[in-house]
Amino acid sequence: SEADLNHPMLRDVVPMAPKRTLVTGCDGQLGHAVRRLAEERGVAKDFDFCDIDTFDMSVPDAYAQYDGSLYGTVINCGAYTAVDKAETSEGRAAAWKANATGPALLARTCSEHGITLVHVSSDYVFDGTAEVHDEDEPFSPLSVYGQTKAAGDIAVAGCPRHYIMRSSWVIGEGRNFVKTMRGLSDRVAAPDDKLDKITVVDDQLGRLTFTRDMAEAIFHVLDAKAPYGT
């Protein structure tokens, strides 16, 4: 109020800045959507966006660059998503590092500072035998990728203030299945390209997760202060 602003004891008091939001994986499909939505809502000034090149959440020393007391929320959009490559020796190590170690360190840091952690998971933590998955279904991953995501979920669930959001077939700005197929088709059609055919699985069922929808869902649970959990 005007009286507070002119009160002799309060005149020189500097108002406490609002808590900031850190978004990891900002260069991925979902990270792009979260950034765009923050800009549209006029709150991007209160956000910090980072990708693995500037903040590798799986490296303990990387956390020294951030003052945890300044943040109220972390939205983890970062992940290793090369499902097939995760079955190789090199990919397996990278997947566990990004999808399990990283979220575990994030969860520990958020717990220490009372930060709300929003973690985006995957339907790969299940075996796909159920027609409908719910929040209480036990983990039953079939792939290395699914195992790493399940491990990350378990770590995040240990953070008192957490939301775990599950995605399926992610479609958005950046690399996605539709753009990949179009690019491969262009290569097959090109006379000077050695690629002569495309092989695609035809026995999978899934539901598209549009990144805009997921970004809006994240903002909704935060704005509504929904009960913590999955």
State each model region's role.
Residues S1-P15:
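Short linear sequence motif anchored by a di-proline
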Residues P18-E40:
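N-terminal Rossmann NAD(P)H-binding glycine-rich loop of SDR-like oxidoreductase domains
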Residues D48-V59:
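Rossmann-fold cofactor-recognition segment
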Residues M57-A98, S111:
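NAD(P)H-binding glycine-rich loop region in Rossmannoid oxidoreductase-like domains
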Residues K97-L105, Y124-R175:
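Catalytic helix-loop patch of NAD(P)-dependent Rossmann-fold dehydrogenases
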